[in-house]
């Protein structure tokens, strides 16, 4: 495709060829309207892995509800150092007892509210985890650990948490522009669509956050739940990854993958991971490719309101990737032609490589970042496009004029020849 430069550092992850497992077939991947996760962990027990092999514990669902902050047992008290602890009363007061006016949204693991905490003088987003789900407890532990160890401008900042009795709450920095999903899909009347430049900026920011998880975090982390609703937008359309409850420590040393239960969101899950349960860094790259396609096309990763062959974004796009003549048909119609054709071709080439069926054919995220940084820095100006169009139209007019003049000259020559013959 020619859009990927080579990174100076050797950071390519090795991937194994995946084979079908009889225990995991596509039939198990069903869409649940009430919850967008593909599968749920067993309600009998749950393995909570902290910082890879630092600490592992098996807890029953009943025991999980009794966990307190001290029970997370984090090495070197990293949580205490980097994340504040809040009482449930403090967070309740900050949201007006979680009143509806403060409600921001709801995800697979709980509800999110906007609040103001006086003791830190800051507006925050507070996620109250679902107390009835074993998944929510695991998410709480993993997310606190991941964000306590992470430090990157393209990852949402964890301010603190509350683990009091049966209550589990996470406190984040507040993102005033909501999620990417709010800006791409089902736009309310009068809301302007994202400009091309903004879309590429968001894509590059999300890719940088993913690159940090894969290549800088120690140990490296596989995000496992990259989707538009988990990309939050700060002022200036600065993208930040959020919701790390499904994150897993990636393969290390000679390992090529992590074997795990398949979890994620339908439409974003890599086919190799869905079939085998073998999770790799390339699984995240596939999910990123789906997000990039959403940014380019304006379509949802999975839309059951469309005809059967067009419900899956990747299945719809794959046949169109084969011929560049189709590329303009793929762009979001809300852009109304306001995009650079060359930039569109390059962005679609990147997306096409990311959603390759075989993980070995997908690029590493560092190469994706390099390509998208170039696209994001190439500012598109509509007036420049109009000038280009005017130049093209002028050339066409000139060619038509030259053709017409040439025809006139031929006709004049023929008339002269006829007159000459008659005179003779």
From Swiss-Prot:
Species of origin: Arabidopsis thaliana
Modified positions (Phosphotyrosine) in chain numbering: 172, 273
Modified residues (Phosphoserine): 229, 259
GO biological process, one term: defense response
Name of the coding gene: PBL6
Lipid-conjugated positions (S-palmitoyl cysteine): 3
Lipid-anchored residues (N-myristoyl glycine): 2
A Pfam family it matches: Pkinase
Record protein name field: Probable serine/threonine-protein kinase PBL6
